[in-house]
Amino acid sequence: MSKSWRFEALDTLFFRDGTPFHQGETGNILPGSVFPPLMLTMQGAIRTALARKQGWIPDKKGLPEKLRLGTTDDLGDLQLAGPYLRFNGERLYPAPLTLFGNKNGKGDWTLTRLIPGPKVDCDLGEGVRLPKLQKQIDGELLNLWVTKEGMESILNFRFPEAKHLIEPDQLWKNEQKIGIMREEKTKVAKDKHLYSLIHIRPHAELEVEVEVGGIPEDWHLQKTQALPLGGEGRFALVNVSDITDPLPRMPELTVSHDGQIRFTVTLLTPGYYQDMNQVVKEGPPQIPGTCVSASIGKAMHMGGWNLKENKPRPIKPLLPPGSTWFFEAKADQLAEIKGVHGSFKGEKTAYGMGQLIVGIWKEEWED
């Protein structure tokens, strides 16, 4: 049975992005943090905690095979979903990258949405339907977090209430830190070897949540523990409990007058795919119907540190949560569409990557 592991930062956290540390060159680009952290970071903390509970002591040989906790590249029996964010005890979701608008000084939102536009010929091909604004307003594509109720409104092609919209700076802040290099053997600070980087300081009520399954019930942590998490020697408190948050409900899918079911698929977690270009144009694999348009966020980068070989991991691109594709399908594909909601598509799905939820969209003439 899967359990919810909830990580609460004890101080700042550091989950390094792909930016290299300076080697004497000029410039103000600092190594930053990816937040929420990628599962490659979370799985290391979780697997280590599980192994320690079974009596394993860290050594250079890695985890014993008998524990069946896998490796960084193959999780064995372990099954993970997430990471998700929880704020004030409520799970949050990345808003689909279809919301567009602005917020005035009083805190009121003016919103519209992206929908597929008319066919055009462009560098992507002939007859491409690029996304357009449903209503012309000032603003920008919104990078927000939403509650379950807010997500259900968006999936139903409605606008969420303001109380269900949370901006990132309400959840965490970036904080610049200064460090100094030390000699590996003596631990003595090296003169003129200062470095700067960006940490994350989460709100006191913010937690990072991972669903952990595929292991015996009594392997889960039984009490609150402090575990190393991320880089720079940072720690987080971990609580394990039953999973209490089902996914946002899928809206009712209907067949339009022209015989088409119009639906969207949105990434809840980063997506990793072998053929990224094809996925951008045609949508994630194994989705019924035809992709007619998409709103995709800026690519993320997955890297990290290879502890076994003591070197950085190769940087690989990911599609960010919130990326949304617009699909059309035939009426007889209804059951297949329903099966997409909450499923994982693409590569590294055992790591929680590529989780999708289904919504609906309408042509302008359907309103």
Regions found by a protein language model. Give the residues of each.
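Conserved active-site/ligand-binding neighborhood in enzyme cores
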Residues: 1-367
